[in-house]
Amino acid sequence: PEILLCDEATSALDLETTEGILALLQRINRELGITIVFITHQLDVAKQIFDRVAVMENGVVVEQGNTFDVFSAPKHPTTKALVERYLGIAVPPQLVPSLPAGTIVELRYKGDAALEPLISQVAQDYGVSIDVLHANVEYFGSQAIGILIVLVSGAGEPLLQALNTLRTHVFSYRELDRGQLVVAAEAADNQEA
């Protein structure tokens, strides 16, 4: 056959069996040149073996492309929600009121930038304190997508320079107020329940 269709082929399997099935499918693709169309709700499977991905909503493809590109820079609201659920913000909501004063920033990295020591370098260069509230790095093949939620504390020009340096060295920079952080954290808690 030219195409092998797998519909939720790993959804009810244990981890070891899933790994075996995925390794077999990769070998079939590589050695026999057979295209594999794999339908799944499991992002772990998608990030591990897919070259390309199509995101569907109500039976319609809403976004498609290279797996890393689609998940590192989602365009459609459905894809954005899927990636947000997967990468998610996991700061416990009860922690937020006790955080010290400072600027809360969501930083997103992709590719090699996710592996650079930006946080420690900015803290050292500008004399600010940067506390990591949440961190997640996921690999899509050999390419990384990272998300950090940090609390940057300092004053005056050094603080502004530190924030600007962070802004210019990441793929996505977004300042969050404490209310946004609580809502995001509670949403993450609800999805895990």
What are these regions (language model features)?
Residues A46-Q48:
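A short, surface-exposed alpha-helical micro-motif characterized by mixed small hydrophobic
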Residues Q64-G65, A73:
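ABC ATPase "signature
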Residues S72-G102, E106, Y126:
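C-terminal boundary and immediately downstream tail of ABC-type ATPase nucleotide-binding domains
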